[in-house]
Curated annotation (Swiss-Prot):
Induction / repression: By steroids (estrogen).
PANTHER family: VITELLOGENIN 1-RELATED (PTHR23345:SF15), VITELLOGENIN-RELATED (PTHR23345)
Keyword annotations of the record: Phosphoprotein, Signal, Storage protein
Pfam families assigned: Vitellogenin_N (PF01347)
Protein name in the entry: Vitellogenin-B1
Entry-linked InterPro entries: Lipid_transp_b-sht_shell (IPR015819), Vitellinogen_b-sht_N (IPR015816), Vitellogenin/Apolipophorin (IPR050733), Vitellogenin_N (IPR001747)
Ranges for domain Vitellogenin: 24-71
UniProt note on tissues of expression: Produced by the liver, secreted into the blood and then sequestered by receptor mediated endocytosis into growing oocytes, where it is generally cleaved, giving rise to the respective yolk components.
Amino acid sequence: MRGIILAQLLALAGSEKSQYEPFFSESKPYVYNYEGIILNGIPENGLARSGIKLNCKAEISGYAQRSYMLK
């Protein structure tokens, strides 16, 4: 009986659909700001490290039905 219940629970969990395709409105632009740091070198005391800081602004807007433009 426990095996049947376990099999039903696994079948129920496996049958759930997930929507992986994002949905964006065609009339509204979406703006994202990203910031990151890239460091080079050995992380020990007394040793030099160098790095660069990155800033990025990404805008996603509707272009056509199910087509989007990334700026």
